[in-house]
Amino acid sequence: MRDLDFTNILDVELLQKQCDAVAEANRNRPDVLRADLLAVLKKASTEGRQKAREALMADGGGLNCAYRISWLQDQITTVLYNFATAHIFPQQKDKFAVTAVGGYGRDTLAPGSDIDLLFLFLPRPAEETHKAVEFMLYVLWDMGFKVGHATRTVEECIALSKSDMTIRTAILEMRYICGLQRLETELETRFDKEIVTGTGPEFIAAKLAERDERHRKAGDTRYLVEPNVKEGKGGLRDLHTLFWISKYYYHVRDQAELVKLGVLSKHEYRLLEKADDFLWAVRCHMHFLTGKAEERLSFDIQREIAEAFGYHTRPGLSAVERFMKHYFLVAKDVGDLTRILCAALEDQQAKSIPGLTGVISRFTHRNRKIAGSVEFVEDRGRIALADPEVFKRDPVNIIRLFHVADINGLEFHPDALKRVTRSLALIDNALRENDEANRLFMSILTSKRDPALILRRMNEAGVLGRFIPEFGKIVAMMQFNMYHHYTVDEHLIRTVDILSEIDKGRAEDLHPLANKLMPGIEDREALYVAVLLHDIAKGRQEDHSIAGARVARKLCVRFGLSQKQTEIVVWLIEEHLTMSMVAQTRDLTDRKTITDFADRVQSLDRLKMLLILTICDIRAVGPGVWNGWKGQLLRTLYYETELLLAGGFSEVSRKERANAAAEALHSALADWSQKDRNTYTKLHYQPYLLSVPLEDQIRHAHFIRQADKAGQALATMVRTDSFHAITEITVLSPDHPRLLAVIAGACAAAGANIVDAQIFTTSDGRALDTIHVSREFTDDADELRRAATIGRMIEDVLSGRKRLPEVIATRARNRKKSKAFVIPPSVNITNSLSNKFTVIEVECLDRPGLLSEITAVLSDLSLDIQSARITTFGEKVIDTFYVTDLVGQKISGDSKRANITARMKAVMAEEEDELRERMPSGIIAPAATARTPPASEKKAGSPI
């Protein structure tokens, strides 16, 4: 147990005496005896674990904590065994053995882990033996432990080990605790002789395949920002796999022996020890903090664990981000160690056992030469070094290795990557400035094959961060939010991967416009460099777009780009967030939105490249972030800007275009009477006619006509659009100042995420509001049923059948994860973004019902919402409202703005409890009557 002093954890002798006293005092009272025994053992266990926790906080040693808890559990189990065989089943002493298996067998136990026990029996065990084991198990269960157990004879263990790899692995880690020790010794001896001997390759192949499947299920990257510490890539289970393989193949009892065998260097062994200790510390803290076997390092506990580790905030990086960077660097070290061990195993197998197949053996043939290369050879589809001195002779060969692998479509031999990792010191300033090295790197980056795969291998081997030190600074860097799913380096590589897919013409269904534009991009090199470097300056105090452009300017010269190419890269990085923000937070029907954006872009070539970069950036954030709705917004912004840059922006008067739209609608309703057509087209103001597509106007016409015939003051209509990934809910209702607030609240209560709102008023005083919500189901039928449920919720709230505060409260109960984040509320009020409207932009932590409360406050302030754009970035929401006062004018005056800002911030800080209680329900009058708006335009829409 690593020479630890356990005396302060538990006084074993005292505990045994206490248990014996319980037996003595309750000889004829079995029920009381059991309860008293349970109380004594539970108290000892609880106090011992608390002392282990205190020691963890004091010395920070994760393995020491796991050793302490394992030792404590050994003593509890031994005392329980002694009690059972001395006082309950006295004939069963030394009739069976109790052994630990699994992680517990390695002398390590996390606070919330299962206790895995193997009870070894003599042949033909007596019934009393089973009862003694049952007594022990029931006491352990009653103590609150999750006990995984098996009762077998030695012969049964051997037989099962031959066919069951899980049982074989468990016995491999077996450790004696108490009882008849010769049974454990016999099993260990027979296991080595009958199971292990000659089956090394089979076991190794099974364990590596098991590891790959586990990675696939947990997320096949070690850079997920909520990693599974036990099962995830680079986690404890990967280290356990190394231990199993080492013990099985090399017959080592301690991983330190791998250094003596030449498998690991002393430095690599120290990395292994540090990784093991760190991951155990994280895991123990997680279990103590949550009070359960929590294995996912989720957002809501990351901050507290970072604090427990003693991390502090530094410029550009918070304490939790620094802690998580440490975690991901450790996970990377685990990957390095895995490759090194696999390389050693292959080398050993090649020397000793010919003819192996599968994962381990690929050495039963001669290496093949690679055309045009003397430094490297091919080994069954994998690139290998021609000799061990390749990198020392010419460090450029480190970069060349990856280039040759790319152009020949080769995987990497583990030994080659091991030697790369051990040669990282050769990547110095001379190599970084070497023209040939940079030429090779640019060839890798812009490859028509699979650049992301090669870049990822370079990154995993530590080459990318050494060759581009600025990239090295963002390796393993996470951003503490719910929006970004990966570390910054993984995000950048995934961005290149998506660009490569578009470049190869494989994205037509998902990105038809980008797929069409990519072949016409004049400078692929500049675009690829911009994509790789766009977040290179994350983690700095200043704006990462500005800092990143400055970094890129230097790197472009190194990479051999021309001055013109460099300026393109610099501009793209400076503006890489612009198109996304404009598309998602601005009214794209407002001409000033388009003219302002066009002024920043200035050329069609820039527009094309910025669109493609934006798509790649959003897609690479993580699964579920990209959807068809965002694609449609970006396409709309692109087309409108392209038209303006090409000189085709329409200067035809607004009135003429509105009249033409009304005539088109009139003609489209040809099956209506002339009178009905005339009456209907007069219902709509210019904003509706100019911004709503004709096909939607026709649907609205039939919807309104049907509601009128049925005498419905309130009606809803739903449809879904799989390509745009949205579901549309149209609400017809008597107008009301708080209508949007109530609709938004009803959507929140139904669990719908609003992404856009089109708000119109008809000339007879009715509201025709269309809400776009994110699509949840892939199947149209399922999504339409969901949409109908949302529609019913809207009708129930508007008609008063349900109270809004109550239904929203049912959705707000599970907010633990978002509460882990702190986003200072901000309000920006400006008249410069639109010629007609004041734009109010709010940014804060999202929560159920927030949009409803914000729009209610705007109504309270006598502001008329003309259009709204709702955008969520994980836990953060950015809501943009285009508003006027009640007479259609922009908001002016410092006092008015200050009042709006104060009220908005109060809502965002959840201080408007009274407002929530006053949230209206049942605002629809029984008859279809409402105020008649003035003849001037009432509300504008924002369809995309």
From Swiss-Prot:
InterPro entries cross-referenced by the UniProt entry: ACT-like_dom_sf (IPR045865), ACT_dom (IPR002912), HD/PDEase_dom (IPR003607), HD_domain (IPR006674), NT_sf (IPR043519), PII_UdlTrfase/GS_AdlTrfase (IPR013546), Polymerase_NTP_transf_dom (IPR002934), UTase/UR (IPR010043)
Domain ACT: 728-809, 839-918
GO biological process, one term: regulation of nitrogen utilization
Segments of this protein annotated with the region Disordered: 911-944
Regulation (activators, inhibitors): Uridylyltransferase (UTase) activity is inhibited by glutamine, while glutamine likely activates uridylyl-removing (UR) activity.
Pfam families, sorted: ACT, GlnD_UR_UTase, HD, NTP_transf_2
Induction annotation: Is constitutively expressed, irrespective of the nitrogen content of the medium.
Biased composition (Low complexity): 925-935
Every HD domain range: 488-604
Region ranges (Uridylyltransferase): 1-371
Record keywords, A-Z: Hydrolase, Magnesium, Multifunctional enzyme, Nucleotidyltransferase, Repeat, Transferase
The EC number(s) this enzyme carries: 2.7.7.59, 3.1.4.-
SUPFAM superfamilies the UniProt entry points to: ACT-like, Nucleotidyltransferase, Nucleotidyltransferase substrate binding subunit/domain, Poly A polymerase C-terminal region-like
Reactions it catalyzes: [protein-PII]-L-tyrosine + UTP = [protein-PII]-uridylyl-L-tyrosine + diphosphate; [protein-PII]-uridylyl-L-tyrosine + H2O = [protein-PII]-L-tyrosine + UMP + H(+)
GO MF terms held by the record: [protein-PII] uridylyltransferase activity; phosphoric diester hydrolase activity
UniProt region (Uridylyl-removing), positions on chain: 372-727
Keyword Nucleus: no
Cofactor(s) for this UniProt protein: Mg(2+)
Keyword 4Fe-4S found: no
Effect of a null allele: Deletions in the 5'-region of this gene appear to be lethal. Insertion mutations in the central part of this gene abolishes the ability to use nitrate as a sole nitrogen source but not glutamine. In addition, neither uridylylation of PII nor induction of the ntr-regulated glnII gene (encoding glutamine synthetase II) under ammonium deficiency can be observed in mutant strains.
PANTHER family: BIFUNCTIONAL URIDYLYLTRANSFERASE/URIDYLYL-REMOVING ENZYME (PTHR47320), BIFUNCTIONAL URIDYLYLTRANSFERASE_URIDYLYL-REMOVING ENZYME (PTHR47320:SF1)
Similarity field: Belongs to the GlnD family.
Domain notes: Has four distinct domains: an N-terminal nucleotidyltransferase (NT) domain responsible for UTase activity, a central HD domain that encodes UR activity, and two C-terminal ACT domains that seem to have a role in glutamine sensing.
Function: Modifies, by uridylylation and deuridylylation, the PII regulatory proteins GlnB and GlnK, in response to the nitrogen status of the cell that GlnD senses through the glutamine level. Under low glutamine levels, catalyzes the conversion of the PII proteins and UTP to PII-UMP and PPi, while under higher glutamine levels, GlnD likely hydrolyzes PII-UMP to PII and UMP (deuridylylation). Thus, controls uridylylation state and activity of the PII proteins, and plays an important role in the regulation of nitrogen metabolism.
Protein name stated in the entry: Bifunctional uridylyltransferase/uridylyl-removing enzyme
Organism: Rhizobium leguminosarum bv. viciae
